A protein has these predicted regions:
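N-terminal signal peptide c-region/cleavage motif recognized by signal peptidases
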Residues: 21-23
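An extracytoplasmic/periplasmic, membrane-proximal ligand-sensing/linker region
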Residues: 32-34, 219, 242, 267-328
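Beta->alpha turn/N-cap motifs
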Residues: 95-100, 104, 162, 192, ...
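N-terminal secretory signal peptides and thylakoid transit peptides that target proteins
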Residues: 1-15
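Short coil/turn segments
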Residues: 44, 98-99, 135-140, 162-167, ...
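Hinge/capping helix and adjacent helix->loop/strand transition within the periplasmic-binding protein
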Residues: 85-91, 106-194, 243, 256-289
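A ligand-binding cleft/hinge motif common to bilobed small-molecule-binding domains
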Residues: 101-110, 175-179, 206-240
């Protein structure tokens, strides 16, 4: 079964969320009514699929339907703002990204919410690797060779494609460039499919982008993967070394997802959500669904999520400032 087929199966299965409880809750206890999971990106993307996986799991466990509501725009800010301004009663949740949690505040003017103060962290859910991939005609076969080639060619003589300014691929390459002492030219595309099309055709020779869409072309030999950006080798491409093991220890630029509630949500509700979601993300059934969606499980309770946000904020603020990316 291909990744696309698995992703479609996940999407279809999650849409068919069961309405009946495995076990009930006493009247008046949380949750006592339908819960809304706001996903700030379009349907059928990875963020949406993870939101549906979490929603389906909670519905099955609690017997109250958790519906997914896609509210797109402004790199996730539209949906995140909706949750930030919702009643803090546990019935409106956010399936957020590293953008809504950390990087958007440095990339957008007039942010409609505070990335930290507007939310109560609930739980981590998953992550995905970026991949540094090249057309086979590119002279480098390893990351050290890529770095050496970029230095030999000179600043901005080597270009790479990614689907967004300030996107996870762009920031991962800026992070690597800062550590390696290179400067590469960023070519912005309107989506990963267009990057991949030009990369396969040789119109552009390099990309840093989320791994899943490129995986089949890497496995077929149509593209060459030089490194993944995750802290450890990726489960679906274990033959591809990490950036960290090729001379940059500690390098980790894996985009991640989480669940949050509006600030002021009662702590007992946050804890109940955190405990249940964390248990789910550790379960074999949910892990399989997350991996079928192209991501990997990243379990962590509300305290772990708060720590993740703090650590990532320090890292990405420094990277964005070094890259001189101005808020738009």
């Amino acid at each position: 079964m291909t990744l696309m087929t698995r992703r479609r199966a996940v999407f279809a299965g999650a849409l068919a969320t069961p309405m009946l409880a495995r076990h009930g809750w006493a009247q008046g206890s949380y949750p006592g009514k339908q819960i809304r999971m706001v996903v700030p990106f379009a349907a059928a993307g990875t963020t949406d699929l993870l939101g549906r996986i979490v929603a389906q799991y909670l519905t099955e466990q609690w017997g109250q339907q958790v519906i997914v509501d896609n509210k797109t725009g402004a790199g996730g800010n539209v949906g995140a703002e909706l949750v930030a301004k919702a009643l803090p009663d546990g019935y409106t949740l956010l399936l957020g990204t590293v953008g809504t949690a950390v990087t958007n505040q440095y990339l957008y003017k007039n942010m409609p919410y505070d990335s930290v103060k507007s939310f109560a962290p609930v739980a981590l859910v998953g992550e995905v690797a970026n991949v540094l991939a090249v057309n086979p005609s590119f002279p480098a076969k390893t990351l050290p060779e890529f770095i050496a080639y970029c230095k030999q060619q000179g600043p901005n003589k080597v270009s790479y494609g990614s689907p967004a300014v300030g996107g996870t691929g762009h920031l991962a390459m800026e992070y690597l460039s800062e550590l390696a002492g290179i400067k590469v030219e960023h070519v912005v595309y309107r989506g990963s499919s267009l990057v991949m099309k030009d990369l396969l055709a040789g119109h552009i020779l390099t990309t840093m982008d989320n791994l899943p869409p490129y995986l089949q072309h890497i496995q077929s030999g149509a593209l060459r993967a030089l490194a993944v950006s995750s802290a450890k080798r990726w489960f679906s491409a274990p033959e591809v070394p990490t950036v960290a093991e090729q001379g940059y220890p500690g390098f980790d630029a894996a985009p991640w997802w989480y669940v949050a509630a509006p600030a002021g949500t009662p702590t007992d509700i946050v804890k109940k959500l955190s405990d249940e979601i964390t248990k789910g993300v550790k379960s074999e059934a949910v892990i399989k669904k997350i991996r079928d969606a192209g991501a990997a499980e990243l379990a962590g309770d509300s305290a772990a999520l708060a720590k993740q946000m703090e650590t990532e904020n320090v890292k990405w603020k420094k990277v964005i400032e070094a890259a001189k990316l101005e808020p738009q």
